[in-house]
Amino acid sequence: MTHFNKGPSYGLSAEVKNKIASKYDHQAEEDLRNWIEEVTGMSIGPNFQLGLKDGIILCELINKLQPGSVKKVNESSLNWPQLENIGNFIKAIQAYGMKPHDIFEANDLFENGNMTQVQTTLVALAGLAKTKGFHTTIDIGVKYAEKQTRRFDEGKLKAGQSVIGLQMGTNKCASQAGMTAYGTRRHLYDPKMQTDKPFDQTTISLQMGTNKGASQAGMLAPGTRRDIYDQKLTLQPVDNSTISLQMGTNKVASQKGMSVYGLGRQVYDPKYCAAPTEPVIHNGSQGTGTNGSEISDSDYQAEYPDEYHGEYQDDYPRDYQYSDQGIDY
């Protein structure tokens, strides 16, 4: 008997193969072994894959479930007849009602490529047989639900149009009923209620909110001059020193009295300091007045003639002479 030569897997192929092998269910294999042996009456052997590899037991299985599905079963030990048996089994279970996505490929079983998919196919076949009424002592597979078609008359169909299902939600909670489109004018009353319009424009309905909280009433556009009194109330301010609460406060530090950069600053406040009666002379020839101006000698002489002598008097005699003879410096 010839065999296919296939080397070991490496890299991604080995990783995929190991991942598939990790999903293999050994308990399901034991249940499938017992079920197949009970249905066919044939022994699979200790190795599940080698026992089903030739396809003979599989063809006998589908013939028990659906007699006459496989006309000829090849019992040769060659590879091609064994692959033909597996192919005939796959065609037979498709005709039996198996879904294409539940069926394995021939190489998955023959080359031990994906025994997990082989196991899945046999479990689905057991469930399909149970659905069709083929029962055994081995409980394996899931019975498929049968289609139940119901027909309703026109009266029941129309009555169901007014019923809101649970999947549609509920209409007992808050909704957007009565909301207008963006930018549309909103009325202060409900026209559908056929009620009269409000007496004035100050009537605010509950849908419009409340006017008891903070609002932007009286706020001006940026850069617009703000008055310190209400023009709508025709009230005149008492004086220009009245500052409303919206204008801030004048009880803290400010830049009032600050001069332009580079100008001289006065050392007194004319509102609180009285003018001095006598000038203050710093250099003897010039002085500084109360307002920071300089006082010349002529001004001082005109104001105080008795105290001004014009020039300094020399009280020391000039009849002596200095002599440095005989003195070495």
UniProtKB/Swiss-Prot annotation:
Transmembrane region(s): none
Residues recorded with modification N6-acetyllysine: K23
SMART domains registered for this protein in UniProt: CH
N6-methyllysine: modified positions: K158
Biased composition (Basic and acidic residues): 306-318
Keyword match Secreted: no
Region (Disordered): 279-329
Pfam families: Calponin, CH
GO molecular function, one term: calmodulin binding
Calponin-like repeat extents: 164-189, 204-229, 243-268
GO CC, one annotated term: adherens junction
Tissues expressing the protein: Expressed in both non-smooth muscle tissues as well as smooth muscle tissues.
CDD domains in the cross-refs: CH_CNN3
Sorted UniProt keywords: Acetylation, Actin-binding, Calmodulin-binding, Methylation, Phosphoprotein, Repeat
PROSITE patterns per UniProt: CALPONIN_1, CALPONIN_2, CH
Sequence ranges assigned to domain Calponin-homology (CH) in this UniProt record: 26-130
Protein name: Calponin-3
Organism: Homo sapiens (Human)
